[in-house]
């Protein structure tokens, strides 16, 4: 076996891609900071039970496991940073009011999420803790869309759903609640025959409502139809009102409502939003409310947030990150060294061509040169 081969769905990040990823990372973190989000850096490795407090069986399957040589306990390589941030909010910061946190870091998956997906993502995201109102969801949705626009993306489609609709239907019917996981699978997969089979012996109102969910999709006007076809429960009315406000705020993007798009239902407790880009089959960003996420750490606070993969964002973003630079000669000259240092202090990229390599500059566009004129070093266009 060749020593340079990497595992399947694992790849090096080469300079041009790394530069673009770093450009986008800086743009997004700067935007998060402008909203008041504080950055945290959780560890890549934790005890397994700390990493698997939420997310269900899917997160467990996606998490790499290994034995700690110091304690003998099982460790996990994180597959999602969100539970770690919840731990920080609940256990370390322990604040009483609203807390805004953001992060950017690597996550590892045992299996790729798609045919060509990487198993090593660079996850970046933002979370609000401590506010149960829709205002926090509106802010997170706006921040997610801002992030995508900063990456130069257009023709964004925002898909909205709400975990509260199915939760309300199951809460009123114990027989349906006992089949909750199977119903979730049928609804998420739009498997109408299976859904019909699972609901055949349920009460008429519950059966009609569950069978209506796969057909309640479209633009924001579908919410009016949902109010007609779903039971007049306060929880459902509140969920539909939340979706209406989220749809109304999403200016300049296409909005789609899909009340059966319940991916992540076991994780979420309220509104869920997913962003898609034309020509890209998989979601580029996901977010939503997950109020129970800190419960395992002894402090369940209201929480909402979003995340995306920077590597995938860099792949589809039109942002140009090829740096310009100043080409300088190599010489044992104090004045030259001082000129180069001054330019670098001013934020310029200065590349000194080593002897014999004056024209080998693969990654940077050297559009200027540092040349000596009348005893002084000056920058001139190339």
From Swiss-Prot:
Q: Which Pfam families does the annotation name?
A: tRNA-synt_His
Domain of life where this protein originates: Bacteria
Biological process according to GO: histidyl-tRNA aminoacylation; L-histidine biosynthetic process
**Record-level GO cellular component terms:** cytoplasm
Keywords from UniProt, A to Z, are: Amino-acid biosynthesis, Cytoplasm, Histidine biosynthesis
Q: Which pathway is this protein assigned to?
A: Amino-acid biosynthesis; L-histidine biosynthesis; L-histidine from 5-phospho-alpha-D-ribose 1-diphosphate: step 1/9
Q: Name one GO molecular function term.
A: histidine-tRNA ligase activity
Protein function: Required for the first step of histidine biosynthesis. May allow the feedback regulation of ATP phosphoribosyltransferase activity by histidine.
Q: What else is noted? A: This function is generally fulfilled by the C-terminal part of HisG, which is missing in some bacteria such as this one.
Q: Which family does it belong to?
A: Belongs to the class-II aminoacyl-tRNA synthetase family. HisZ subfamily.
What HAMAP family does the annotation carry? HisZ (MF_00125)
Q: How does it assemble?
A: Heteromultimer composed of HisG and HisZ subunits.
Name recorded for this polypeptide: ATP phosphoribosyltransferase regulatory subunit
Name its species.
Answer: Burkholderia multivorans (strain ATCC 17616 / 249)
């Amino acid at each position: 076996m060749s020593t340079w081969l990497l595992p399947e769905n694992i790849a090096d990040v080469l300079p041009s891609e790394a530069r673009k990823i770093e450009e986008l990372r800086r743009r997004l973190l700067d935007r998060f900071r402008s909203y008041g989000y504080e950055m945290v850096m959780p560890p890549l490795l934790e005890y397994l039970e700390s990493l698997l407090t939420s997310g269900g069986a899917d997160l467990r399957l996606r998490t790499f496991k290994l034995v700690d040589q110091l304690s003998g306990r099982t460790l996990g390589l994180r597959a999602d940073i969100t539970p770690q941030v919840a731990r920080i909010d609940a256990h370390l910061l322990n604040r009483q009011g609203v807390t805004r946190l953001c992060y950017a870091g690597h996550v590892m998956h045992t299996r790729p999420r798609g045919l060509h997906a990487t198993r090593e993502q660079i996850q970046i995201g933002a979370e609000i803790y401590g506010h149960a109102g829709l205002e926090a969801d509106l802010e997170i949705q706006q921040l997610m869309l801002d992030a995508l626009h900063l990456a130069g993306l257009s023709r964004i489609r925002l898909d909205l759903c709400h975990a509260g609709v199915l939760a309300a239907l199951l809460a009123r019917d114990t027989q349906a609640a006992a089949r909750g996981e199977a119903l979730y699978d049928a609804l998420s997969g739009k498997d109408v025959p299976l859904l019909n089979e699972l609901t055949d012996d349920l009460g008429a109102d519950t059966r009609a409502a569950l069978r209506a969910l796969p057909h309640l999709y479209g633009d924001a006007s579908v919410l009016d139809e949902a109010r007609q076809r779903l039971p007049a429960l306060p929880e459902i009315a509140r969920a539909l009102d939340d979706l209406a406000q989220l749809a109304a705020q999403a200016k300049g993007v296409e909005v789609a409502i899909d009340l059966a798009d319940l991916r992540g239902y076991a994780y979420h407790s309220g509104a869920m939003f997913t962003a898609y880009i034309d020509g890209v089959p998989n979601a580029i960003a996901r977010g939503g409310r997950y109020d129970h996420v800190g419960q395992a750490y002894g402090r369940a606070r209201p929480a909402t947030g979003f995340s995306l993969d920077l590597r995938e964002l860099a792949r589809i973003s039109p942002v140009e990150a090829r740096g310009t630079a100043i080409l300088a000669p190599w010489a044992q000259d104090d004045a030259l060294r001082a000129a180069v240092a001054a330019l670098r202090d001013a934020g310029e990229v200065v590349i000194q061509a080593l002897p014999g390599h004056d024209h080998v500059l693969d990654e940077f566009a050297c559009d200027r040169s540092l040349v000596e004129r009348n005893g002084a070093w000056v920058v001139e266009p190339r």
